[in-house]
């Protein structure tokens, strides 16, 4: 076998097996068994003692399956099958008593009776056996990358066959991920099984590359099966490669480079930096650390040197796994300048300026290329409407050929492809979903990194196969993806937050309010509007009259009331002695002339002068009590209510005045307005001294009769009202008389005398009672209106 390594390629063999290249059916010419195979079987039979019994059975039938086991962290079984060629029938497959299978390789048609092909395509395996021992390839369908070239990339396949009669599907076998040094070789084992004739399924046709003919993918020249070269070639970097292309295709250039590097270097250094070993231990497509460029090794050491804690080292290790794996996968690790490559995590932590939801975000890369992302205005579905990638920049260097912006589907990936490898860092990142960065930047470091991993992992699972419309197949992963997207929309503040363009201006404006807070206060020079006793606090502009000390010097007895529009002039403000004279004049004038308009204007001007000078004395109480009595007499309950509010505040300052009288007025006013809340509060704050007051006692008795609907007692107390309580009772006396009349008509039958109504409802005379009953449309008995027919009057009670 060692002599075969140096033999040149047999030209006759090449002409013989290349004669059918241009055939349309892709069939092979008759061939004879290679005598070198018998030598290989004998050599393997002497080594494999564990499977001697099965090997003897295989030698009797003339059919052998060679299995080479390379224990590099996990058992990798390589199977090869050989079967006889029926040359008398002029085809390369066994005669199965029906038409030839795989005659038209380009058609994707089902097998016999509408079923898929029973025999799948075989992949020839070339394994190394302790040094220079090699075996020629099986004349079956090889991997599309195994052509006559200087660099050969044998693909290691996981052996899924455990029984002798179990069929092996080579086309669906996943590539074994080797994460340890290829130099640690183990003893190979061989086993032979029963004949297992394989034939390519018609459904596997689209998965093979179309650039090579069938013979070039199947054959090696005799004696050249173990002839290998160790010339490394930098794979072609495809500029228009999609993000997820390397994840969905098994025969990518990155895998060929990785597998060729593992198989062509049997001798490796036993010692290596522990940090680099950690990075390549779980990598699925990365090459050996010895084959890395020197600048790339120095870059890794620089990254770990910059770490300050163990957490930083762990984070850096995770980032380097992704960055280096992506670089080695697309071949850019040999082309980029590692000395200028930014350290992972250092360039992604800066916040980018916040963009609006519908605004295009442009990312500048290190090589001058740009990535433009248009954010979708709605959550859910595809989060990216347009993503334009020009060239390769730092963003692609960080994440490799993965579309981190796609949530549930990728328009650039193939429709029926499925990822056949799972990232080793899949599960740990699920713990960090609740610790994403809440930065304002839509593409901050932590948020982009974690979000990109989550979205990419979701696209790789079962629920990640979505069509272009955003609807996926009904699988188990779909519900979890939808639940996660709903949960992400609720807790992700970036997707729903709108930028306030005046945010900074408002902050500066708020900060400017406190710049001069400790300085001396100055008088307000702008015009002011002051309304005395106005319930709207904005009308007086929140003036603090305690700090504005004004002493008036005006001697005018009368003064027109004007609302203040500026700081008051002392020459227009009257002092207290002048105000006392003015109050005496107003009382006399109102008593004689009953001119309420003039009296109210003068009383309001007196109150204004007292307010601007900050005077709150017994004289102030007298002024407000006088104004309240005048307003109560004339029925101006709005002005009376304002005076009552000021009097309550003045009484709370222990200023002398008619506290009992106006407390009774306040109780009666609450009965008038039916304000039960304030009435209850007022009753709760009554002291024993106030309850003993005649006015307060009368008001409490009246309130009790009103609450019990005891109209007889109510109108009896109405006739006995002290001081000016009768004026307040007059406000709601008519309302209570109507309620009492309804109760009387319902109670008395058949007739109700009008004289009885007059006495019970506290009318002064019969004429006043008739004027009250006339608008009510009551029915009277007889021609005179002296008696009310209660039965007939029931119909008009709802209108009263």
UniProtKB/Swiss-Prot annotation:
All residue ranges annotated as the PCI domain in the record: 636-800
Spans annotated as Disordered: 118-149, 175-229, 245-273, 335-394, 407-519
Biased composition (Basic and acidic residues): 338-352
Pfam families linked: SAC3_GANP
Bias type Basic residues, positions: 419-433, 508-519
Highest taxon of source: Eukaryota
Database matches in InterPro entries: PCI_dom (IPR000717), SAC3/GANP/THP3 (IPR045107), SAC3/GANP/THP3_conserved (IPR005062)
Polar residues bias: start-end ranges: 252-261, 360-387
Positions with biased composition (Low complexity): 120-131, 184-201, 409-418
Annotated GO CC locations: nucleus
PANTHER family per the UniProt record, alphabetical: 80 KDA MCM3-ASSOCIATED PROTEIN, LEUKOCYTE RECEPTOR CLUSTER MEMBER 8
Protein name: Leukocyte receptor cluster member 8 homolog
Gene that encodes the chain: leng8
